[in-house]
Curated annotation (Swiss-Prot):
Catalyzes the attachment of proline to tRNA(Pro) in a two-step reaction: proline is first activated by ATP to form Pro-AMP and then transferred to the acceptor end of tRNA(Pro). HAMAP family: Pro_tRNA_synth_type2 (MF_01570). Keywords: Aminoacyl-tRNA synthetase, ATP-binding, Cytoplasm, Ligase, Nucleotide-binding, Protein biosynthesis. It catalyses: tRNA(Pro) + L-proline + ATP = L-prolyl-tRNA(Pro) + AMP + diphosphate. PANTHER family: MITOCHONDRIAL RIBOSOME PROTEIN L39/PROLYL-TRNA LIGASE FAMILY MEMBER (PTHR42753), PROLINE--TRNA LIGASE (PTHR42753:SF2). Homodimer. GO terms for cellular component: cytosol. It comes from Sinorhizobium medicae (strain WSM419). Belongs to the class-II aminoacyl-tRNA synthetase family. ProS type 2 subfamily. Pfam families: HGTP_anticodon, tRNA-synt_2b. GO terms for biological process: prolyl-tRNA aminoacylation. This is Proline--tRNA ligase. It is found in: Cytoplasm.
């Protein structure tokens, strides 16, 4: 992508409405634009990041055995009345009526709809276990939306729902998602700590929040420092193996970890003082096992191997991509801007033409842009007439991991400068060497 043809409205000043770093940087870099309270447009730069975050989530959901579908944002009130949650959910749920005066709602969650889909098609235990997920917009009418897309009213969610014959199967499904979430957050450059959580309006008796540590987090968290060094499940993880899933779950729940809502001071004090960690954190994922809460109310049953009807056991598993993006920024930035982890940056490499219109610079930049693009990189070419300082500031604030700087003096010697955005390390080399080095490190 040539920057001269890309829509990226950079703001020179810090927006007054932004209270935290991620909100400020997302507005300044032109990633998002507020349309009304808690509702945002994702502009091209932000959409590129969001798409890459979603791609990682999809890969790990698919790896764990979940199957993608897509449910609508608008739901019939009848399903919620059937489950008993229509009146209980409260004012966060946006209720509307269609032209036939039928009550509808803008879905804040999808337990009722997915249960209705399941009961319509699945009749036998032979079709279990089953885990279905989608990535879709939701709406919750927050009293006080704040912090940009960190706590907005309309937001994107990945929701997965598992269906099993009995509790043992459901707990295995829960542990599969537990391991999948650890892998997902690690690939997004985050160390997420699973903490026992309240089930809230979704219900159930087993739940974990996945929390990343950040000074701007809304939650106060208490945990053992060992979590910072635990190994993440590898690519070869066998999600079907019960023993493997049990081992991962037991390891990651063997140490104390709790948010302030679930905190037990005596248990935390029992940890040796040097191994305690108290900090603030951001919730980036939440998983629930809620047994037969919805399946019982809505008649989701299958014939078991004994020939009798069994009410299925369910779980739900949520990750908010539009919340994850600012969470990643909160965990990875400096005074100059965002530092994106590789793989989710809007671009992999930015080629900075220090003197657009200079034949030697234009030729070298053209080659870098072409060859690196053919090698599979997402490349941004800054071919604008902006002054050098402005180009460097733009490259830094949008957080592209690698900068290749092409100036008339260096290119006269056949050389360019390669800068690592995270470390600030710089290295001068030939154009050929720069291409080879970047391709080899891919």
């Amino acid at each position: 992508m040539r920057l001269s043809r890309f829509f990226m409205p950079i703001l020179k000043e810090n927006p007054k409405e932004a209270e935290i770093v991620s909100h400020r940087l997302m507005l300044r870099t032109g990633m998002i634009r507020q349309q009304s309270a808690g509702i945002y447009t994702w502009l091209p730069l932000g959409k590129r990041v969001l798409d890459k975050v979603n791609a990682v989530i999809r890969e790990e959901q698919n790896r764990s055995g979940a199957i993608e579908l897509l449910m609508p944002t608008l739901q019939s009130a009848e399903l919620w009345q059937e489950s008993g949650r229509y009146d209980a959910y409260g004012k966060e749920m946006l209720r509307i009526k269609d032209r036939q005066d039928r009550p509808m709602l803008y879905g804040p969650t999808n337990e009722e709809m997915i249960t209705d889909i399941f009961r319509s098609y699945v009749k036998s235990y032979r079709n279990l276990p089953l885990n279905l997920y989608h990535i879709q917009l939701k709406f919750r009418d927050e009293i006080r939306p704040r912090f940009g897309t960190m706590r907005s009213r309309e937001f994107l969610m990945k929701d997965a729902y598992s269906f099993d014959l009995d509790r043992a199967g459901a707990e295995h499904a829960y542990k599969r998602m537990f391991a999948a979430y650890l892998r997902t957050f690690d690939r997004l450059g985050l160390r997420a700590i699973p903490m026992r959580a309240d089930t809230g309006p979704i219900g159930g008796n087993l739940s974990h929040e996945f929390i990343i540590l950040a000074d701007t987090g809304e939650s106060e968290v208490f945990c053992h420092k060992d979590f910072l060094g635990f190994d993440i499940p590898g690519e070869d993880t066998n999600f079907d193996d019960v023993a493997s899933m049990n081992a991962i779950f037991e390891k990651w729940t063997s140490r104390y970890a709790a948010t302030s809502e679930m905190h037990e001071e005596a248990a935390f004090d029992a940890i040796p003082e040097g191994e305690r960690l108290s900090a603030r954190g951001i919730e980036v994922g939440h998983i629930f096992y809620f047994g037969t809460k919805y399946s019982e109310a809505m008649g989701a049953k299958v014939l078991g191997p004994d020939g009798k009807e069994h009410t299925v056991h369910m779980g739900s598993y949520g990750i908010g991509p539009t919340r994850l993006v600012p969470a990643i920024i909160e965990a990875s930035h400096d005074d100059n801007g965002i530092i994106w982890p590789k793989g989710i940056a809007p671009f992999d490499i930015v080629v900075i033409n220090m003197k657009t219109g200079d034949d030697a610079c234009d030729t070298a930049c053209g080659r870098l842009y072409s060859d690196l693009g053919k090698a599979g990189f997402d490349v941004l070419l800054d071919d604008t007439d902006e002054r050098a300082g402005g180009k460097f500031a733009t490259a830094d604030i949008i957080g592209v991991p690698v900068q290749v700087i092409v100036g008339p003096r260096s290119i006269a010697n056949g050389e360019v400068e390669v800068k690592d955005r995270k470390t600030g390390a710089r290295e001068t080399m030939t154009v050929e060497a720069a291409i080879n080095k970047l391709v080899a490190a891919r």
